[in-house]
């Protein structure tokens, strides 16, 4: 209720929910964030306690759907990071030597408590990020639940190889925790990606100093509350809020932090690598994407159209995996374009808490302005806007929010700036192709190589194309169908290393070979 009030929406949410007949449940969760007025200031979570930043400074947290300030974020710096690292060092011995079953049990309790308070987390995520409430409720928060549960159990079943040397010796491998891990996550899928880094690090026996995006800190703050209630030992997880150039870089450059897992922009990833590599830290960097969505004439047409809507505009297009470049084989180009544009034009843009909303608010004013600048650039480069391209004013409490119509642009060259640079918003380009070689040239032309989508009924072609596309993930006749056991990451400037599955457990541990002579 406090979040709603601070978001400027408490006074109208009840009648709106009742009138629409949707299932917004304004429960009172067992989280002090929703019950305590003093929580208007978000706090750091250090050594098992909520605490103000050492410097006492805060900055505003904006609700992107209203444009209004609704909470204050700690402006943490190196002093706060020092406290967090000290707490993590003190906790490491006990946590790393704790039986795996006991560690697993604590992480499962955290998972269960997030699930029990799913509605509160989803509401907070929607208000903080601008995404539709239904998306937060059905995707983001359930995935956070799964992240903790998956790694809590995966760590119990991890095995390592052993080799016998013909009656001479036995070699076996130990995997030991690295110590303290630094985890820095982005604003687009806040709790989803924050927990995807934290969970494997903790499950491997490490302690963590983590920083969520300063744009969307709320659910990370709530996670700290959950960890206290779940009985996570003090100092095992420490959550620092603040700007990347201060708190974030203090984490990256700290000599006692052995590994950095970062998801965000490629330029920031480059800066992190320049800082951390000379210190010989382990690095996992999941960076930008400019993903191709390739549609052949033999596709399942209706499914390709419907799924392309999702892969283009889910979460306002603010997902690194969105297919922002659509390439359609010429025989069905006009048919596909007509069907696609017609459906895009019907997508409702507006209040994220409205159950009928498909496109919510852009996460911040600077990002809102960046997206608009790219729409203008596309027109300057000769692009024709087939639908969208304008800002939206939903009125009411959302009159000052950051809303943009889903936008489809035609007529651009494959190698123009609009098609080469990451926009990260509800903007896609569409163009025809004639041959496999041609579309491979288009698909692989960017500096990025994160994901790609193929639509074809020809299995031979699917295998052939998947092998030649320069990306870390290729979906065939689907999009964002994820198995937590599989590796996740990109090629080229889309990153270094892999997250997900046992690869994440490998990253947060060091291998040690032991050789015993018979």
PLM ranges: what are they?
Residues 1-35:
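Intrinsic disorder/low-complexity segments
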Residues 35-64, 390:
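Hydrophobic face of amphipathic alpha-helices that form TPR/SEL1-like repeat modules
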Residues 66-72, 257, 294, 348, ...:
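Conserved C-terminal structural/oligomerization subdomain of aldehyde/semialdehyde dehydrogenase
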Residues 67, 103, 125, 148, ...:
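Residue-level signal for inorganic ion chemistry
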Residues 68-158, 168:
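Glycine-rich loop-to-alpha-helix module at the N-terminal edge of alpha/beta enzyme cores
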Residues 69-76, 90-97, 183, 293-296, ...:
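Short, well-ordered beta-strand elements within core beta-sheets of diverse protein domains
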Residues 115, 160-303, 433:
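Rossmann-like NAD(P) dinucleotide-binding subdomain of oxidoreductase/dehydrogenase enzymes
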Residues 259, 267-413, 476:
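ALDH superfamily catalytic-core signature
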